[in-house]
Amino acid sequence: MMLSTNGGPASPTADGWVNYAIPVIAGLMYRDSVEIDELKHPFRVESLGVVADSAGAGRHRGAPAQEVTYTALENPVQVVIPCDGQFAPPRGVNGGHDGTPGSTHLIDHNGHTTKLPNLVNMHIRKDQHIRGRDSSGGGYGDPLTRDPARVLTDALEGYESIGKARDIYGVVFTGRIEDDSLAVDAAATKARRAELGSATKTRGRDPAAE
């Protein structure tokens, strides 16, 4: 089964593709239907979606990671899971931030979570869950140079939080997502980026030179 695809890397001209998967697929992979897989196999998908704040930040953003959680409907159910990329996150380029590594966890009935290795061949019970997360994409270029309008779109799409927009991209908003009033505060954004840029230079790195 293939229910999710890891996020693709940013490039000098574009953000990473959410449906990138691996280079040989080039975004053209057909993902399984959750409903059909649930009809064919003794399991239920509890959640499937992108992971907020997982993407590698940059002038062009890497694609966010995707996460799926599922449980068994019978006792026991065998699962075989390959999960590469748990130790070396996708790298950012030219000042872009690294993406986040993949992971697989077993969740017991009491909520206790156990991290699983790269390759798993095991049985799970009806009261257990598997949570798998793909890698996200690394960013390209310094985040402080990203178009604030793109950061706003990312926040509205749920790819980036308002906190990450402020702390990493230096973009400040007014309004709220809930009532469709979220907007870029241009003056506050200019001041915030100047503040973050000054702090970066103090640490020995100049975004303007990248």
Pin down the residues of each PLM region:
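Glycine/proline-enriched, intrinsically flexible loops and inter-domain linkers
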Residues: M1-A209
